[in-house]
Amino acid sequence: MLSPLDILGLTRDEFLDRALAYGAKRPRALAIYRAAFRQGVALEPWVTLRRPPIVNSHVEGDTIKFVQRHDDGLETESVLIPMFGRAGQMTRTLCVSSQIGCAMGCRFCETAQMGLMRNLDAAAIVAQWFGATHDVGERPTNIVFMGMGEPMDNLDSVL
């Protein structure tokens, strides 16, 4: 028996390839993938949307900071920042983390004081967007790596 697919860590093409092993035809697999990311629902029992729970959130003005706790007990912090775009429309930028802690050692940075604890995998990085969109209820317009960690030190997961 095949184990459930954790869709958050897969590209669309990776998911489609693996969904075929579960007997899904390409159109159905595409619908499952779209539903997972657009509506936040798993349409099949063999698909999981496993993500770290949000254990804390803080709102200051229109800015929302939220903390997700991973299976190992370590936490990541993400921030949704509202701003007006060039055309005057409201946008939301999500600052995501690529690591827990950081090895850079910058004296001005609180995260650097922790040292590097571990890299996040692609699923944990995408789970920050998923948490903002489906748990917090604010779909980001832009995403930047300005949370915890140095994205260039975790390129395999970032890309």
Give the positions of each predicted feature:
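Conserved Radical SAM active-site core
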Residues: 82-100, 104-159
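Flexible, acidic/Gly-rich N-terminal and inter-domain linker regions that tether
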Residues: 1-92
